[in-house]
Each structure stands twice: as structure tokens, then as C-alpha cells.
A protein has these predicted regions:
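N-terminal membrane-anchoring alpha-helices
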Residues: 1-45
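Short solvent-exposed loop/turn micro-motifs enriched in small/polar/acidic residues
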Residues: 32-34, 140-144
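Membrane-embedded segments
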Residues: 47-142
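A substrate-binding/cap region within the structured catalytic cores of diverse enzymes
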Residues: 145-149
Length: 151
């Protein structure tokens, strides 16, 4: 019986540590992580265009314009030709929004040719649906709605 209890409580303890670690990673590490990948489409030519894509900023009280500043600085260090934001600017616009500071931060993004934005699922609902396009346009982004640019 004692052996069973040791195994049982050892298993429960291990599961609690594992679950706690996953929750900690999901809320405290992953949201602040920046990943960078470089893809080469044609190695036979010296012509290239650098595109930086970012998304899912999910701005909220504990990830605000100060955190966005770090992302903007990282983007600008890449010297992009084109920047594409693929949606989900705010986490929940009805609960938290700081448009003035967010616009100022997004305006700092430098791109040689264009800054492009598309809508994410969190940009289409709630108060964000009425503000997203305006925020991105004031930030210097071309907002696409089921359309293309270029050829």
C-alpha cells in the first residue's frame, strides 16, 4: 500500500510540475518570443526583396506599446523592403486599447516599399472591427480586404 501511495503521489506531483511548466511557458514566455526565419526562393539570382511578416501581437494591459516597441526595433534591424502584418493587433479591444501609443509605435516601422496589413480574427469582432483599419492606416499601412496589390 505504501508503495502504491508513493507511486501515486509521485505521478501526481510530476503531472502538476508538467502542467505548471506548460502554463508558465504559454503565458510568460511564448507571448514575448520573437522567431526569425530566412527563406531563399531563388538562389540563382542576386536580386532579392526582404519581407518581414509579423502578427498576433494581442496587445493588452500586460503586453502594451512598450513591448510593441521591442518588436518594432527588431523589425527595423532587419531593414525590410516590405512589412506585412497578418492580424490580431489587440487581444480584446473592448477590454483594453491604447490607439494613440500603438499608432505611434507602428509608425516607427520602416519599409523601403510598403507596409501591408490584413485582418485577423480578433480584428473583425467587437470594437476592433470599427477601429482596426483606421489604426493601421494612420500607422502607414495599406490595409487589404480581399484584394491584391501589384501585378
Amino acid at each position: 500500500m505504501i508503495r502504491f501511495l508513493k507511486i501515486f503521489f509521485g505521478t501526481v506531483f510530476t503531472l502538476l510540475i508538467l502542467i505548471g511548466s506548460c502554463v508558465f511557458y504559454a503565458f510568460k514566455i511564448e507571448p514575448y518570443r520573437i522567431a526569425s526565419n530566412q527563406l531563399y526562393l531563388n538562389e540563382k539570382t542576386s536580386d532579392f526583396i526582404k519581407v518581414v511578416q509579423f502578427s498576433d501581437t494581442h496587445i493588452k494591459a500586460d503586453f502594451n506599446y512598450k513591448n510593441l516597441d521591442k518588436v518594432v526595433n527588431y523589425i527595423n534591424k532587419q531593414n525590410p523592403d516590405v512589412v506585412v502584418f497578418t492580424g490580431d493587433l489587440y487581444d480584446n479591444y473592448a477590454k483594453y486599447h491604447d490607439d494613440e501609443h500603438i499608432i505611434k509605435e507602428l509608425q516607427k516601422i520602416n519599409a523601403t516599399y510598403d507596409k501591408i496589413a490584413i485582418w485577423g480574427n480578433r480584428d473583425c469582432g467587437g470594437g476592433a472591427a470599427r477601429q482596426y483599419e483606421n489604426i493601421m492606416q494612420q500607422s502607414g499601412f495599406t490595409v487589404l480586404k480581399n484584394e491584391k496589390i501589384g501585378r
